[in-house]
Regions:
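N-terminal nicking endonuclease/strand-transfer module with a His-rich metal-binding environment
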Residues: 1-159, 163-245
């Protein structure tokens, strides 16, 4: 049986309610130094495995937090971000977390990562994250209510982007859920809905991938296909038209 080839990019998304311990931990570490944040990553992360079913370990290196507006946050901006996440928790917002994971050869093929020099085009990954988040919040109806923060994490063998999303002024509907207590007892409480439809998740991943894939290489491939399908006399006309464009 032939071995299954894993995709070049995978995404896993989940959510927790406002009272979840890891929601509070994420907030507590927002304004801490990056070395401290990655040392305590497991206390903030709600995703046990990435899309390749690899255990989500503490990253060896992190780019630091970025957002929709800023590539790198100043200490003052970190404090402000922490305040917004705190308000979201106080108002019973859901916290979604999403991870994009990559195969290194896929990143190399798309000129995002150089395996020899270990250089990573973080700007391209940030741009792709912003495009994907714009798609996600739009389709979830949270364009004007959601805020998010993200960081690029690097381990020995893989690179991934970890994103956290909240609503300081929540718009999600309430639902009654059964919760298990500390001693195994169960009870019901009201929580905001955090479910994300599969169709939205598929668009989310596609938006990221489409932004990240090397456009020059894609355009070259399209041009090759056009040339292959045209008759010889049509090719010269097509080249002439292209030069005019």
């Amino acid at each position: 049986m032939p071995s299954r080839v894993s995709p070049g990019i995978v995404n896993v998304t989940d959510f927790v309610a406002a009272h979840a311990k890891k929601f509070g931990s994420y907030i507590n570490y927002i304004d801490r130094e990056e070395a401290i944040r990655i040392d305590h990553f497991d206390q903030q992360n709600i995703l046990s495995v990435d899309g390749y079913n690899h255990y989500m370990e503490n990253p060896k290196k992190s780019s630091g937090i970025f957002t929709d507006q800023y590539d790198h946050l100043t200490p003052t901006q970190r404090v402000e971000l922490k305040k917004q996440f705190t308000v979201a928790q106080k108002h019973q917002s859901v916290m979604w977390q999403s991870v994009f994971s990559f195969r290194n050869d896929f990143l190399a093929e798309n000129n995002v990562y150089n395996p020899k020099t270990k250089q990573l085009d973080e700007a391209k990954l940030r741009d792709a994250t912003r495009v994907a988040m714009n798609d996600f919040t739009g389709k979830m109806g949270m364009t004007h209510s959601a805020i998010w923060s993200a960081a690029i994490h690097r381990n020995t063998d893989n690179i991934h982007i970890h994103v956290a999303i909240v609503e300081p002024q929540p718009t999600r509907e309430w639902k009654r859920v059964t919760v298990e207590g500390k001693h195994g007892e169960t009870y019901q409480e009201w929580q905001r809905k955090g479910y994300v439809p599969k169709k939205i998740l598929n668009h989310f991943k596609a938006a990221f991938a489409n932004e990240m894939v090397d456009r020059d290489r894609s355009l070259a491939r399209i041009s090759d296909l056009i040339r292959q399908r045209l008759q010889p006399d049509q090719r010269s006309a097509w080249r002439h038209q292209s030069s005019l464009d």
